[in-house]
Amino acid sequence: MTVINTLSNALSSLYNNEMRRNKQAIIMPSSKLIVNVLRVMQKEGYVGEFEYIDDGRWGKILVQLMGRINKCGAITPRYSLTYREMISLPDYIRRYLPSKEIGVIIVSTPKGVMTHKEAARQRTGGIVLGYVY
């Protein structure tokens, strides 16, 4: 079976396991982008520790869930935003987050994967990947 969007599959797997009240989630196939998104989610306190398991094929990621994810998902198509658009992100916040203070939009920038708040602080634009709250 062909996997079209691995990031979308990973985020929906996290959300589904969270809704089933599981303590762990296994994400496969893994990629560097998924690991970087998980680091951002871990720094924001949405997931616990995670580890890469090499199975000789694509690899798996075992993620410890903390019960803090209400909703998460990938934003498709992946829009490119400039710094000025990153500061005034009201369309994306209104569409994907319940309020300005709750949740984050995950952005891939030239300085790495980070939240939309960090990207605005560092004065950089990037590509919108997903959201979590």
From Swiss-Prot:
Gene3D superfamilies for this protein: 3.30.1370.30, 3.30.1490.10
Highest taxon, organism lineage: Archaea
MF terms in GO: rRNA binding; structural constituent of ribosome
InterPro entries with a match to the protein in the record: Ribosomal_uS8 (IPR000630), Ribosomal_uS8_CS (IPR047863), Ribosomal_uS8_sf (IPR035987)
Alphabetical UniProt keywords: Ribonucleoprotein, Ribosomal protein, RNA-binding, rRNA-binding
A family per Pfam: Ribosomal_S8
GO cellular component: ribonucleoprotein complex; ribosome
One GO BP annotation of this record: translation
The keyword rRNA-binding is annotated on this UniProt entry: yes
RNA-binding found in the keyword field: yes
Main function: One of the primary rRNA binding proteins, it binds directly to 16S rRNA central domain where it helps coordinate assembly of the platform of the 30S subunit.
Subunit composition and interactions: Part of the 30S ribosomal subunit.
Similarity remark: Belongs to the universal ribosomal protein uS8 family.
Protein name: Small ribosomal subunit protein uS8
Organism: Metallosphaera sedula (strain ATCC 51363 / DSM 5348 / JCM 9185 / NBRC 15509 / TH2)
